[in-house]
Design a protein with these regions (language model features):
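Intrinsically disordered, low-complexity, positively biased terminal segments
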Residues: 11-13, 24, 29-141
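Conserved hydrophobic beta-strand within the GNAT/NAT acetyltransferase core sheet
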Residues: 16-20
Length: 141
């Protein structure tokens, strides 16, 4: 992704966008902390049914992110260790991939719970401002 950022800068793009699975903790950390992206929206079942071995039986919810291509280098964020009192915390499992491989129903429970929380938070005008040390998205209204 860093190489893509520099390529975009060299080619005069102002922003890069993509999606990622909101339940995958390592992707959340990469996108929010290492890359410092902004989450713009939540899309339930974005790709529809994906019958491959990894995704079969799951719903393809995705967060849409945008990454500003400004300055000399990408800006990283810190993990949030102490959220503010009014922040909404959206917990995700530390390893959804392991859960998905063992218990599809548990995976779907997580998927639907996180979906509901994100949609409610965005409906209230919430913005994702970080990711906590406890595998939680930090949403500020």
């Amino acid at each position: 992704k860093i190489d893509q950022w520099y390529w975009a800068k060299k080619n005069y793009y102002s922003e890069i966008s993509w999606t990622f699975d909101p339940l995958v903790s390592r992707n959340a950390k990469l996108n929010l902390i290492k890359l410092g992206v902004n989450i713009s929206s939540y899309h339930p079942n974005f790709y529809g049914d994906m019958p491959d071995a990894l995704n079969a039986g799951d719903e393809s919810d995705r967060l849409m992110v945008s990454w500003k291509v400004v300055g000399e280098n990408p800006v990283q964020r810190e993990l949030v260790s102490t959220p503010k009192p009014n922040d909404i915390l959206i917990q995700i499992p530390a390893d959804i991939v392991a859960i998905r491989s063992k218990d599809r129903e548990e995976n779907l429970r997580w998927r639907r719970k996180v979906r509901e929380q994100f949609l409610q938070a965005f409906e209230k005008g919430g913005q994702v401002v970080g990711f906590s040390t406890n595998s939680e998205y930090v949403v500020r209204i």
